[in-house]
Amino acid sequence: MEPPLELPTQRKRVIPSKFGILKRNAEIEAEKNRENLQQSSCFSHINEIGKEIGLEIWKIIDDSTIQKVPKVNHSTFETNKSYLLLMGQFYDGNMNIKTYNIHFWIGELLINSQETINFCNDRIEELERIIKYNQKQFDSEQFYPEPILYREFQGKEGDIFMSYFKSYGGPRYVAPLKLTSASAAIATAAKQYKLFHLKGRRNIRVKQVDISSKSLNSGDVFVLDCEDFIYQWNGSESSRLEKGKGLDLTIRLRDEKSAKAKIIVMDENDTDKDHPEFWKRLGGCKDDVQKAEQGGDDFAYEKKSVEQIKLYQVENLNYEVHLHLIDPIGDVYSTTQLNAEFCYILDCETELYVWLGKASANDQRTVAMANAMDLLHEDNRPSWTPIIKMTQGSENTLFKDKFKKGSWGEYVNDNFEKKPITGKGVAAKAVQEKINVDALHNPEKYQLSKEERKSTIPTLHHVDDKHRGELKIWHVRNRNKFEISQSEFGLFYNQSCYLVLFTLFAADGSNNSILYYWQGRFSSSEDKGAAALLAKDVGKELHRSCIHVRTVQNKEPNHFLEHFQGRMVVFKGSRPNATTEVSLENLSSSLQGLYHVRGTEPINIHSIQVEKAISSLDSNDSFILVNFKNTISYIWVGKYSDEKEAALQISSNVFTGYNFQLIDEGDETSEFWESLETNSSLSLLKDYYTQLRTVEQEKKTRLFQCSNNSGVFKVFEIHDFSQDDLDSDDVMILDNQKQIFVWVGKESSDTEKLMANETALEYIMNAPTHRRDDPIFTIQDGFEPHEFTFNFHAWQVNKTQQDSYKSKLSAILGSNNSGPASPIMLPTSGVTLKPTTAATPKPITTPTVTTPKPITTPTVATLKTVTPAVTLKPTTVTTPSKVATTTNTSTPSPTTITTFYPLSVLKQKTNLPNDIDKSCLHLYLSDEEFLSTFKMTKEIFQKTPAWKTKQLRVDNGLF
């Protein structure tokens, strides 16, 4: 008999919710998409692509193989290959959203290969799909900007592409090696020398050239890589920027060889005997070097030609594609002509932009790219012309610059006239527009765009600083962070970076955090980058809302300063020890110096260490002079200063244990001057800024940057400025409501100098208040007088006088003593490092005049040109700290004059004896009468700034 059938035990069936089913289905679909993408993709590890911030590069080996390039070779490009580049960055300061630029780069040997270009087009679109897929997997509901696509060709790369390789000295082009086997490749690479040519004005390009002495020219820099030795050859007319980038390249080459190669820096003026090995390896001699003209113009070599600009609207109607040419509004296009429902092609002759409206259809986007490719092949356009695709809301600065300023983001759907293409339209050539000085005086009236404002200081108006919270600070060094103790809070170093985390506790128990990553003024690029990355890591560890604020020294917002309650001091140098606590007791010997105090309330009190010199003083501020503990230190209060209480607060909070004496300006003792200035002759001069600067004047002091680097002269204001905003490539205009300064950068062009002077004149003539009698001073980069420098907090005297190439070289030479490897070798015999003739300043041969020379504008001014009678350029310059007059070789000196005359005779100015030089009447006074008249000796008078001596001579009738 069969056993009874056992029924299975019934179980409750769990029915998943509708949302659970949808979620699971979405996960299954995403997994299928990932597998399909992985199987069809030429890229490996697609889940890792774009995960980290920074640059990723792939080399295209053939039509089916793509190889990722290690970071050590990121700046090297083979001229017979093509590359794909992906740059990930944070979007608009938001650490949770990334934006991507995708480039494909074609070497010069493949420029005419249409197959390669088509393959790169496919791969760049594939990379775009991978990025979008990974973004969706991270957060499907989050808005992500569309990746921007670029085409690049060797030697014609855009500014964005070039910016990725500034730290490498620019991209390096390498010719392909003709090898027969792998072993031969290794042997040949070890023996082959390479010669690199560096050229450009702002974006230095590096190109491999023929190894021959005839490849050298006097206007550029060349680097010869011989594996065991790396030679940098500086042409006599090469720029300091080219030499600095050359040094970056040589160090990069050395690091690729594990620091085994030795670097030798040489100049064209060195003889063949100084560097025999260099000429032996290069082949030839010094006589083969070409003139600078043979290398071509730097600006022409680098600058892209921006010619006619046309805007097309793409329409796909009834399977027919139409391109409609849109007329500009006036001379330029406006974003009000862009409709979110359509796609557009912006044709700039040497650039093609494809703009995709957010509401445009997919088929319209496809035909827009296809039509851009068609335009690319018309009119014999250069093969290196890039096609850049971008979506509404993710436009880059280069694209925005093509449209009317102030209109960006004003998208409307109004109808506008569209003209079908019937022929080749010719757009009007771009012309220089007159600078609107009324917009400079009244920026709110014209609603200047963010690009023109160029404000670099972060603002957090929504942060409530009234609540107290928890403060943590880390010091950044060697890519790691080290937490510091509370006793060190508020003490910073200008060569270091810090993370400052402030947590706000609300009454309801919730909390929010603000994370500042503070960058010292002279901190290294490595520490700055590490601070940004470590800030990202700290934000992730918090697991809550966190605002990230990049904070630069001298541009700290009040909500940052308030955390330290009058205890913030910035010292010179770097923090002595990374891992252990820094005690002020242990640092007492290194604290000696002069500290400039600013701030009148706890929320803005701070102090910065400045040069210990009398010239650093300012009657409008207070200073702390710290000496040894067993001696007297001083708190010096200027006669117009409001910072007395702030200086007392910092001295008691920070410099504890020191014996301070409070001194008002005018009551200084001889001991004070001697401890401040070791040079006894300068201590007698007491040369510093003594004029009144009102609070209203401080608030209204404004700085404008004048630049012609885009081909059109532009003027824009820099808000919350500091000394670091002075760009040696441009001309700056400073208005402190009393006078106008035209600051001329060392590398500024003649056009910038001329038009900046014209702009300054128009600016003063069109001021809302009567300012026609205000003087205009023209001063040179590196020779700023006190009247100019007092407008900047903690002016660094030597900063503008430093040569970037020399300072960089000095820094590397200084690291020889502490670093494991020797970056630069200076042989003891036969090889020396000499300055080029280009770096030697030309002697001044103009007559002695005042410096700087004020300009009193006439009642009726010329608005377009500067009349010859108005001399804006000074004929002499003086150093800011230790001023000396510049004399003509024909002008008598006090030691050469033997005949003296009384003051009454010299004041007549007519019927003077024939042996008197009227340009220096004061020198013909006897020593006794000179001292009685000017209250100083002739020797001290000669060392007094020219602007002071002029006024003294005028007051006594001897000018």
UniProtKB/Swiss-Prot annotation:
The superkingdom of the source organism is: Eukaryota
* Ranges occupied by Gelsolin-like repeats: 64-116, 204-244, 309-366, 479-529, 603-647, 713-754
Could you tell me which residues belong to the region 2 X 10 AA repeats of T-P-K-P-I-T-T-P-T-V?
840-860
CDD domains listed in its UniProt record: gelsolin_S2_like, gelsolin_S3_like, gelsolin_S4_like, gelsolin_S5_like, gelsolin_S6_like
Q: What is its main location?
A: cytoplasm
Which terms in the Gene Ontology molecular function aspect does this entry carry? Answer: actin filament binding; actin monomer binding; phosphatidylinositol-4,5-bisphosphate binding
Keywords, A to Z? Actin capping, Actin-binding, Cytoplasm, Cytoskeleton, Repeat
An example Gene Ontology cellular component term from the record? actin cytoskeleton
Q: Name one GO biological process term.
A: actin filament severing
Region (Tail) location: 1-53
Q: What is the annotated localization of this protein?
A: Cytoplasm, Cytoskeleton
Instruction: Spell out the residue ranges making up region: Core.
Output: 54-832
sequence repeats span which residues?
840-849, 851-860
Output the PROSITE patterns linked to this UniProt entry. Answer: HP (PS51089)
Q: Which Gene3D superfamilies match?
A: Severin (3.40.20.10), Villin headpiece domain (1.10.950.10)
Q: What InterPro entries does the entry give?
A: ADF-H/Gelsolin-like_dom_sf (IPR029006), Gelsolin-like_dom (IPR007123), Villin/Gelsolin (IPR007122), Villin_headpiece (IPR003128), Villin_headpiece_dom_sf (IPR036886)
Give one Pfam hit by family name: Gelsolin
Domain HP spans what residues? Answer: 895-959
Question: Family per UniProt?
Answer: Belongs to the villin/gelsolin family.
- What is the documented function of this protein? Caps actin filaments but displays neither severing nor cross-linking nor nucleating activities. Protovillin seems to be a villin precursor with only archaic capping activity. It lacks essential changes in the sequence to allow bundling of actin filaments and consequently the appearance of microvilli.
Q: What is this protein called?
A: Protovillin
Name the species this protein comes from: Dictyostelium discoideum (Social amoeba)
Classification from the root reads: Eukaryota, Amoebozoa, Evosea, Eumycetozoa, Dictyostelia
